[in-house]
Amino acid sequence: MIKDNIVIRPEKKEEYREVENMVRESFWNVYRPGCLEHYVLNQLRDDPAFVPELDFVMEKDGKLIGQNMFMRAHIKADDGREIPIMAMGPICITPDLKRHGYGKMLLDYSIEKARELGCGAVCFEGNIDFYGKSGFTQASKFGIRYHGVPEGEDASFFLCKELIKGYLDGITGEYTPPEGYFVDEALAEEFDKQFPKKEKLKLPGQLF
């Protein structure tokens, strides 16, 4: 996709480290002191569930400003079936360009590409205030539970969007994120030493 001075295109192997550093900058001290997302991204690329056709970067005036990626996943339906879906993320925009509409542009483009590949639905963890603008709703409205969250407890972070209308009709079940999203924090700490040193801060609003 090319629009004005914005390009969305597949990620190239030779820019993996540059993209990882961008992700690190975007998530640093946001949800926890430091971040894990750049290591998660590094690990997901080698995961069997990784969808290389849906591994995107965004450029503005030739400079990388964002990325998004998808993983194959499934819902374990209560009737015993496994319903193929996709998981999404990490997705990011560089800190200096957040809240300028680039994130929604990247999100909407990549979701449409997932639809073109035949993806029926996308589930992931996110903020409904942002992702709701692109048609995501809380997954509980589809009858989908998040693994490990007891029934009745808050799972408002768990979002879903049908890409094929009616794809989740009549389905109830449980979603577990693909294994690649679960990383060893000690290994993540070692990986982070490959990047420029940054101060980890405990800040209000962090989740961990």
Descriptions of predicted regions:
Residues 63, 81, 94-105, 117, ...:
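Conserved glycine-rich acetyl-CoA-binding loop
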Residues 165-208:
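Acidic/histidine-enriched, glycine/proline-rich intrinsically disordered or flexible terminal extensions
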Residues 54, 58, 89-92, 119, ...:
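Internal, conserved structured core segments that host functional sites
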Residues 7-19:
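A short beta-loop-alpha structural element at the N-terminal edge
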Residues 88, 93, 99-112, 123-124:
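Conserved acetyl-CoA-binding loop-helix of GNAT-fold acetyltransferases
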Residues 74-88, 98:
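A conserved beta-turn-beta hairpin within the catalytic core of GNAT-like acetyltransferases
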Residues 20-23, 27-69, 74-75:
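Active-site rim helix/loop that mediates acceptor-substrate recognition in acyltransferases
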Residues 116-119, 126-153:
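Conserved active-site alpha-helix within GNAT-family acetyltransferase domains
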